[in-house]
């Protein structure tokens, strides 16, 4: 039986990031290295969309109750389980005020802190083998619809609220200036993995 790695003072790890930022890649690397199970939010939402027979891009076709239940389930897992890697857009936001959670935000920004959507689109094209136009819809349209919905559901309609606010996180990694191996190394060093 494989024994997972114990990290003092860290019960669970969340990994959040915008579409195509590299959050899933970081989460998968952490899961493999630490031998902790990975809960991937995107895969769960994809399943919900399939069950509802709606496009993943059709954020508003997904009833609010699915978002609310999903985020409550994430919070429950973070409170009640241990040695989990939770990767979802709102996982770090959900983890606020829950002790023992190490929250990672993965961004793709230039040196001035500006998001690089063209890089995220390119990554999506390569990872999912979809067209540039499909990737643009994912990154530009679906992301904006998610934000509008989540601002309404979780921030009382505050248009200045974004889950990628760096103040919510213990570690911010910029994949614009680091490759996959460097990014994983930064995360592992930050959590105290030797």
Question: What kind of feature is each model-predicted range?
Answer:
Residues 98-102, 167-169:
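Short glycine-/polar-rich loops that comprise or flank the Walker A/P-loop
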Residues 130-183:
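Small-molecule kinase domains that catalyze NTP-dependent phosphoryl transfer to phosphate-bearing small molecules
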Residues 39-99, 114-118, 122, 130, ...:
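ATP-dependent small-molecule kinase phosphotransfer cores
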Residues 3-10:
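Phosphate-binding P-loop
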Residues 67-71, 180-188:
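Short, amphipathic alpha-helical "lid/cap" segments that border enzyme active or binding sites
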């Amino acid at each position: 039986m494989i024994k997972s790695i114990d990290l003092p003072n860290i019960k669970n790890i969340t990994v959040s990031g915008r579409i195509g930022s590299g959050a899933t890649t970081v989460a998968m690397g952490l899961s493999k290295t630490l031998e902790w199970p990975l809960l991937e939010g995107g895969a769960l939402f994809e399943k919900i969309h399939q069950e509802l027979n709606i496009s993943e891009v059709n954020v508003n076709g997904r009833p609010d109750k699915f978002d609310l239940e999903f985020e409550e389930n994430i919070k429950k897992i973070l409170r009640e389980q241990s040695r989990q890697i939770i990767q979802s857009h709102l996982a770090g936001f959900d983890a606020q005020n829950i002790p023992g959670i190490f929250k990672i935000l993965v961004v793709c920004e230039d040196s001035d802190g500006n998001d690089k959507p063209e890089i995220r689109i390119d990554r999506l094209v390569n990872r999912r083998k979809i067209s540039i136009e499909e990737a643009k819809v994912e990154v530009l349209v679906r992301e904006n619809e998610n934000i509008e919905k989540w601002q309404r559901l979780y921030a009382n309609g505050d248009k200045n609220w974004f889950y990628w606010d760096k103040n919510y996180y213990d570690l911010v990694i910029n994949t614009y200036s680091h490759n996959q191996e460097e990014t994983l190394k930064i995360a592992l060093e930050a959590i105290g993995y030797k």
